[in-house]
Amino acid sequence: MMTVTNQARCEQHYEQRYEQWAAPLRGRPGVVRALNIVNHGIVVVFYAAYALLLGWACVSDPWKLAPLVGVTAVGFAAVSFFRRRFNAPRPYECCSIAPLIARDGAGKSFPSRHTFSAFAIAASWFVASVPIAVVLLVAAVVLAVCRVLGGVHFPRDVVVGALIGSATGALAAFLAVLL
C-alpha cells in the first residue's frame, strides 16, 4: 500500500513530467486546438469504423455479428464496471496540472475507456481487413497519446485500456473467423 508521503512524491513527480510534455504545447494555442480536434476526430473515426465493420459483417456473414458485438459489449461493460468500482482519480484531480483537453467530471480514469474502445475496434478489424486494422491501431495509439498529453489520463490508464481492448478485439475477431 502506498503511503501518503510516497503518493505525494509520486504525484509531484508526475506533475513535473506532465509539465515537461505539455509546456511546449501550452504556448501554442493552435497546437492545443489541434490536439483537441485530433482527440475528438479520432473518436468519430472509431464510431464510423465500428459501424462499417458491423455493416461488413452483415453483408459477408451475419453470424460474425455475434462475437463482434457480443465480445466487445461484454468487454465494454466489464471496463465500465471496473472504472466505477475502482473510481481512480484523473491527473487534474490529484495533481496540480491544467489539462489541455477540457473534461467535466471526476474519477473513473482507470482504465481509459476511449483507449479500450479504440483498440478493441482496431483489433476486431483484423477479421475484415489487415491494412485497415493496422491504420486503426496507429490511430488508437495517437488517441492514447492525446488522452495523456491532454491531461485527462495517466499513462497507466491508456496502457491498460489498450491491452484490455486489444485482447477483447482479438478475441472478437478470432471468434468471428471461426463462424
Regions from the language model: what does each represent?
Residues 1-50, 63, 79-107:
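N-terminal transmembrane-helix/juxtamembrane module of multi-pass inner/ER membrane proteins
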Residues 30, 61-64, 91-92, 129-134, ...:
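Membrane-helix interface segments
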Residues 44, 48-51, 71-75, 161, ...:
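Hydrophobic alpha-helical membrane-embedded or membrane-associated segments
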Residues 47-56, 138, 170:
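Hydrophobic core of alpha-helical transmembrane segments in multi-pass integral membrane proteins
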Residues 49, 63-71, 132-135, 156-160:
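Alpha-helical transmembrane segments of integral membrane proteins
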Residues 52-78:
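Interfacial segments of alpha-helical transmembrane regions
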Residues 54, 74, 78, 82, ...:
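Alpha-helical membrane-inserting segments
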Residues 96-179:
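Membrane-embedded catalytic cores of phosphoryl/pyrophosphoryl-handling enzymes
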